[in-house]
Amino acid sequence: MELRVGNRYRLGRKIGSGSFGDIYLGTDIAAAEEVAIKLECVKTKHPQLHIESKIYKMMQGGVGIPTIKWCGAEGDYNVMVMELLGPSLEDLFNFCSRKFSLKTVLLLADQMISRIEYIHSKNFIHRDVKPDNFLMGLGKKGNLVYIIDFGLAKKYRDARTHQHIPYRENKNLTGTARYASINTHLGIEQSRRDDLESLGYVLMYFNLGSLPWQGLKAATKRQKYERISEKKMSTPIEVLCKGYPSEFATYLNFCRSLRFDDKPDYSYLRQLFRNLFHRQGFSYDYVFDWNMLKFGANRAAEDAERERREREERLRHPRNPAARGLPSTASGRLRGTQEVTPSTPLTPTSHTANTSPRPVSGMERERKVSMRLHRGAPVNVSSSDLTGRQETSRMSTSQIPSRVASSGLPSTVHR
């Protein structure tokens, strides 16, 4: 039996869950495109989806803010329909063997600071900054970072007067302990500074592969939070960032120096990392680590397949010279995939030619690739925070291998 939502969206398989609801793959029947559908039982003790959808609507139009297609109630469920996005940074981090290059970390940092700045400009703090809550776009938007999950977001100032909320103590920890700011651990009301400090820990997580306070054992959740807090406070920033450019320590020291109601200097923090990016000689080609890994994997698989076909062809036509070097153009389509032509160029341009891992002639065989369905979330983007050329990535996020693409949403995503 076909299940429909809002008389327009066909409900498909479950692709994720969170503490505030489950996420399903869906189809917009009128537009013939996939969407993400978030469901929350109306009988839940503390309904959150309606509040979250209202925050999403207030954020609409911003760079990297998910587009909401429909909200309402259907039977016993509150429903929010959003456009479909690609994998989270946590998914991609695992795909890249839990280590990002400095270039990738800096490309991400630039966009992530901008996402947080935008949310703050709309009078909210996110309060759950972590890799799971940043997703990459699909297709033409494959180089852009999106921020999701406003289930824990809170208004920190009055929209009209900009009067800041009062300083409070003895607050319970809200968010994810691994990335929580020290003040959050101490029970202090969160403000803008805490979102940015959390981002600093996320960036060092990407650099290091793990944080010193991961994997601590404790009998209860409260005791574990206390152990994480103790380890975090006893680890000097310079020790945490040892072996990495000083900008990361400078960033964290700046965030920790902010007072409760201070407005952070987002431009200064962005410029800190942009200057490092340029000093390292990196190019704003928006080729991330996962693009390069997939590119190499495609090349190896294609080369092996081409050699196999050439051997078979030579055996069938040993005297036919045209049989040698036959390109491998035939490919069986996988069930549940669609062939697309990537929007990003697959041939090197003047600023990417030096980094191309394969010759131009081989790239033509990449023009048609299989795109698997990815985890749900929405899309809305502008190029205002991209200082480089976003259309030069050789492979888009939508082309990462199925072990990431089809993995679905982690259980901690999309509360």
Swiss-Prot record:
Cellular component per GO, a single term: cytoplasm
Polar residues bias (residue ranges): 380-415
The EC number(s) this enzyme carries: 2.7.11.1, 2.7.11.26
Positions annotated as active site in the UniProt record: 128
Molecular function in Gene Ontology: ATP binding; protein kinase activity; protein serine kinase activity; protein serine/threonine kinase activity
Signal peptide bounds: none
Subunit and partners: Monomer. Interacts with per1 and per2. Component of the circadian core oscillator.
Family: Belongs to the protein kinase superfamily.
Protein name, entry field: Casein kinase I isoform delta
